Amino acid sequence: MLLRMTEFVGCLFVPSTTFLLLFSVKSAKIILLGILPTERSMKMYTIENLYDLTHTMAADYLKGFTYPWEALKGIKDMIIALGATLNKDDFIEREPQVWVHKTAKLFPNIYLGAPCIIGANTEVRPGAFVRGSALVGENCVVGNSTELKNVILFDNVQVPHYNYVGDSILGYKAHMGAGSITSNVKSDKTLVVIHCDPEIATGIKKVGAMLGDNVEIGCNSVLNPGTVIGRNSNVYPTSCVRGVVPENSIYKKNDTIVAKR
């Protein structure tokens, strides 16, 4: 199914569903172009529907919120409190409020700012800059010249090459291709709005991207402030994404979204 916002000429809401169907009438035929989230479908972008909380040490913290961006303000305090409870047989406090699992692999020439937690079997590669307030799960890759700031990375997340991830939450097995980044501040410095129907005012100046489980972001893509990507969705390389992308979808160019088959 294809959605191209500039082409549809009509719409139909289907009762008992969470989608608005878009269609084009050509040669007396109705051609289904795709799906557009309605207010009822915003539940797809809740923490419950984006993430499997069994794959993060922040599970108890995240359960206290409905939408993921609501959790951003408290990440620093959460990490400090969580770090104090970690098993000292498993984690080393390398310096105040910097906890690293004994099985994590730290390469030379990295920076780990407090507070942060680096999980089991995670690699932090040369040139990585963890500015602080970063909870990195198990089996993750924080790659060369990658910068993290005020983030939660679920287990098995990979940000392996020249990525910037700020004020964001990345779900289980989310992967960002080389050079892809999250933009977390609007150019006019106003508060970030989640562009769905209806729009949601976050009341926050800095909001990056919320990536559901198993999301793939193509190389050199930019995720604009407040972008939300549903579970199991892909974003094409060099894309500029703004707003929300439904689960099980492929985001192409020019706001074209294709449902996975």
Predicted regions and their residues:
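Alpha-helix boundary/capping motif
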Residues: 6, 18-19
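Terminal amphipathic alpha-helical/low-complexity segments used for targeting or macromolecular assembly
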Residues: 7, 11-14, 25-97, 232, ...
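Glycine-rich hexapeptide-repeat left-handed beta-helix
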Residues: 58-60, 153-155, 160-261
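Long amphipathic N-terminal alpha/beta scaffold segment
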Residues: 78-123
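ABC ATPase A-loop
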Residues: 99, 117, 135, 210, ...
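Extended, compositionally simple hydrophobic/Ser/Thr-rich segments
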Residues: 116-117, 122-152, 156-161, 166-168, ...
